[in-house]
């Protein structure tokens, strides 16, 4: 809740990010992507032994949003659940591809069911899918 966040900030235990932050922690960077599914989205880049992977969060949920489909091989932004104009989402998609130098195999999308074929994974006790990308 907002009151708790205010208390944490006053106590010096909360740092608010504004824009891109390279090496927030060693090997972890945060990138702002603007509007999309919600306001002022952020993505996290993690440097692993297998290279850098970008978790797109809600900036791009599914591969077909970014890559299109066989019938429609172009960006398919989901504007039904978006904030702001579709152009902002398309610009965000451009940024995503720029950050991974076009290598979509280094993207982790929140609702990407194809990850099961790419990374080892297991179900947690709570029924969550845990993927190992390192």
Feature map (PLM): residue ranges:
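Active-site beta-strand termini and strand-to-loop segments that position acidic
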Residues: 35, 44-49
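Metallo-beta-lactamase
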Residues: 1-33, 81-104
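Residue-level detector of solvent-exposed, low-hydrophobicity positions
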Residues: 12-15, 44, 118, 126-128
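Pocket-edge structural micro-motifs
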Residues: 18, 32-34, 57-58, 111
């Amino acid at each position: 809740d907002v009151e708790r966040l205010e208390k944490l900030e006053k106590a010096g235990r909360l740092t608010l990010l504004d824009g891109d932050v390279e090496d927030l922690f060693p090997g972890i960077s945060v990138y702002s992507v603007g509007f999309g599914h919600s306001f002022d989205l952020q993505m996290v880049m993690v440097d692993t032994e297998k290279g850098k992977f970008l978790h797109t969060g809600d900036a791009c949920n599914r591969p077909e949003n970014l890559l299109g489909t066989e019938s429609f091989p172009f960006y398919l932004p989901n504007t039904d659940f978006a904030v702001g104009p579709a152009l902002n989402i398309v610009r965000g998609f451009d940024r995503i591809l720029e950050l991974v130098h076009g290598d979509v195999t280094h993207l982790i999308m929140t609702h990407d069911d194809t990850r099961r074929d790419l990374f080892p994974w297991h179900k947690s006790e709570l029924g969550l899918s845990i993927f190992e990308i390192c």
